[in-house]
């Protein structure tokens, strides 16, 4: 692990001022800086502007070199607001890329893109730092073992199981439940999985970041009494940050996760909410740098930027990084270049459907659109594979019959098709589940359902043993035993009403 001079906070004062330049131009978050001949910084070097503005307020802005323009000028993107900067101010070249604290000192803390703590819990030990720009592991270091990562969420474990050490995408438009699903996964996995997690909040709502932090403190994932016992490090670059910070905050979180994998040899969970905002920030920066836009106005380097981030998220012989990424889908269009580029890197996709959310079925995971490379008999076993395929067949047949039902009604269907529709509606409701993190909204306690129990439940519905139970008995329950108990309660209530 390379240890670099820190590029923010008090460490800057110790930097040699041998390479310093002057601000020549400021356009929003983009600075042009002139350096003396022969003293030009490298691409991705961190530059620091320190001084006072006209009102006497202290300024400390870190930028990253993006372009060498010629005539001894470079173009850099600021990682924080450029308010108060003026032409002619001194700019110091740190001689290295942005570096952030890594290791056990990061657990239980909240950082910004520069690796500075923003939780007001005092300074962080910065003796071990790592540059945010690194190359992906070599082929020979990669690990290719295939094993299932149980989440306790029925629809995920049965129909689109996650791979341990794989990359998973949660696709959905605005307000269909991506962040709630990520928070539930953090809750379930942090309790069941002993390793550490890193959460990268990239360009999302500050309120959600705060809610997540409070929830983690309540559940004990962050230990307030003994911060070192915490299981998670949080890195936030939220919606109000300049595009430079939103573009790089994902790399800051990834760098912290890589240290746990490579040096501590741990299995790490990396949550990114939202990978689309990383692309969006890259698009803003690209436009500010004057590059010609590509399809739908995205940056021409979209695939390269996505690849350089995603290829570092992988499993090596030392340890693994299992990554769960929320992907906002603009206007619910999965063919948009941002989600379409992300698809190529994933082992499993969990697609959230607005139609299911409108029906009140949560998690609103589309069972027919969601995919996984792990759903193969040699990996999950014959029983799991066959149950999943039969569930999908039943739901697909129901989907095909919906036009006929809406025009002619259920009575026009054959006896067999009516039975299929009844079972499909039960399956659809049984795929819903109460979440621990949504207890305040639903009023029902969260449920973690093991894989074996999930398979047993769906096999019972498919076999026809539960054909006599009402549909609503299967809605928002955990195991199949809860559904039968709920059916008995519903029957008692209807008897009492009579």
UniProtKB/Swiss-Prot annotation:
Subcellular location: Plastid, Chloroplast thylakoid membrane
Any single GO BP term: proton motive force-driven mitochondrial ATP synthesis
Main location (coarse class): plastid
SUPFAM superfamilies per the UniProt record, alphabetical: C-terminal domain of alpha and beta subunits of F1 ATP synthase, N-terminal domain of alpha and beta subunits of F1 ATP synthase, P-loop containing nucleoside triphosphate hydrolases
Keyword Transport annotated: yes
Catalyzed reactions: ATP + H2O + 4 H(+)(in) = ADP + phosphate + 5 H(+)(out)
Keyword annotations of the record: ATP synthesis, ATP-binding, CF(1), Chloroplast, Hydrogen ion transport, Ion transport, Membrane, Nucleotide-binding, Plastid, Thylakoid, Translocase, Transport
Entry EC number(s): 7.1.2.2
Pfam families the record matches: ATP-synt_ab, ATP-synt_ab_N, ATP-synt_VA_C
GO molecular function per UniProt: ATP binding; ATP hydrolysis activity; proton-transporting ATP synthase activity, rotational mechanism
Recorded topology in the membrane: Peripheral membrane protein
InterPro entries documented for this protein: AAA+_ATPase, ATP-synt_VA_C, ATP_synth_F1_bsu, ATPase_a/bsu_AS, ATPase_alpha/beta_chains, ATPase_F1/V1/A1_a/bsu_N, ATPase_F1/V1/A1_a/bsu_N_sf, ATPase_F1/V1/A1_a/bsu_nucl-bd
Binding-site list for ATP: 172-179
Entry GO CC: chloroplast thylakoid membrane; mitochondrion; proton-transporting ATP synthase complex
Family note: Belongs to the ATPase alpha/beta chains family.
HAMAP family in UniProt: ATP_synth_beta_bact (MF_01347)
Assembly behavior: F-type ATPases have 2 components, CF(1) - the catalytic core - and CF(0) - the membrane proton channel. CF(1) has five subunits: alpha(3), beta(3), gamma(1), delta(1), epsilon(1). CF(0) has four main subunits: a(1), b(1), b'(1) and c(9-12).
Primary role: Produces ATP from ADP in the presence of a proton gradient across the membrane. The catalytic sites are hosted primarily by the beta subunits.
Alphabetical list of PANTHER family matching this protein: ATP SYNTHASE, ATP SYNTHASE SUBUNIT BETA, MITOCHONDRIAL
Name of the protein in question: ATP synthase subunit beta, chloroplastic
Originating organism: Oenothera biennis (German evening primrose)
Origin organism lineage: Eukaryota, Viridiplantae, Streptophyta, Embryophyta, Tracheophyta
């Amino acid at each position: 692990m390379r240890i670099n001079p820190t590029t923010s906070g008090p460490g800057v004062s110790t930097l040699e001022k041998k390479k310093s330049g002057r601000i020549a131009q400021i356009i929003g978050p983009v600075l042009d800086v002139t350096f003396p001949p022969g003293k030009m910084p490298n691409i991705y070097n961190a530059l620091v502007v320190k001084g006072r503005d006209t009102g006497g307020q202290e300024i400390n802005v870190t930028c990253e070199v993006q372009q060498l323009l010629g005539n001894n000028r470079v173009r850099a993107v600021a990682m924080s607001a450029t308010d108060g900067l003026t032409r002619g101010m001194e700019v110091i070249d740190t001689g290295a890329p942005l570096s952030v604290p890594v290791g056990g000192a990061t657990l239980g803390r909240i950082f910004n893109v520069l690796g500075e703590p923003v939780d007001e819990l005092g300074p962080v030990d910065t003796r071990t730092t790592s540059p945010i720009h690194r190359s992906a592991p070599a082929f020979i270091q990669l690990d290719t073992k295939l094993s299932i990562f149980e989440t306790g969420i029925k629809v995920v474990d049965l129909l689109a199981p996650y791979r341990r050490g794989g990359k998973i995408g949660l696709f959905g438009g605005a307000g269909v439940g991506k962040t709630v699903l990520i928070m539930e996964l953090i809750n379930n996995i942090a309790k069941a999985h002993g390793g550490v997690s890193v959460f990268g909040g990239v360009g999302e709502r500050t309120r959600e970041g705060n809610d997540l932090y409070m929830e983690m403190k309540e559940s004990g994932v962050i230990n307030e009494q003994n911060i070192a016992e915490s299981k998670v490090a949080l890195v936030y670059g939220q919606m109000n940050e300049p595009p430079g910070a939103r573009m790089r905050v994902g790399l800051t979180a990834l760098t912290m996760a890589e240290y746990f994998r490579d040096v501590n040899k741990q299995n790490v969970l990396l949550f990114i909410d939202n990978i689309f905002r990383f692309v969006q920030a890259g698009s803003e920066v690209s436009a500010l740098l004057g590059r010609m836009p590509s399809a739908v106005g995205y940056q021409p380097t979209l695939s390269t930027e996505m690849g350089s981030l995603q290829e570092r998220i992988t499993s090596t012989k030392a340890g693994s990084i299992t990554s769960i990424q929320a992907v906002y889908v603009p206007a619910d269009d999965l063919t948009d270049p941002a989600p379409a580029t992300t698809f190529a890197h994933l082992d499993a996709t969990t697609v959230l459907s607005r139609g299911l959310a409108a029906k009140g079925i949560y998690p609103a995971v589309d069972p027919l659109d969601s995919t996984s490379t792990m759903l193969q008999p040699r990996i999950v076993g014959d029983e799991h594979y066959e149950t999943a395929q039969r569930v999908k067949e039943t739901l697909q047949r129901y989907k095909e019959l919906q036009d006929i039902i809406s025009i002619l009604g259920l009575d026009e269907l054959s006896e067999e098709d009516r039975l299929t529709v009844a079972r499909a509606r039960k399956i659809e409701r049984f795929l819903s589940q109460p979440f621990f993190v949504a207890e305040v909204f639903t009023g029902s306690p969260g449920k973690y359902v093991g894989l074996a129990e999930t398979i047993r439940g769906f096999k019972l519905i498919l076999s026809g043993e539960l054909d006599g139970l009402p549909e609503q008995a299967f809605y928002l329950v955990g195991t199949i035993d809860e559904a039968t108990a709920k059916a008995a309660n519903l029957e008692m209530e209807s008897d009492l009403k009579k």
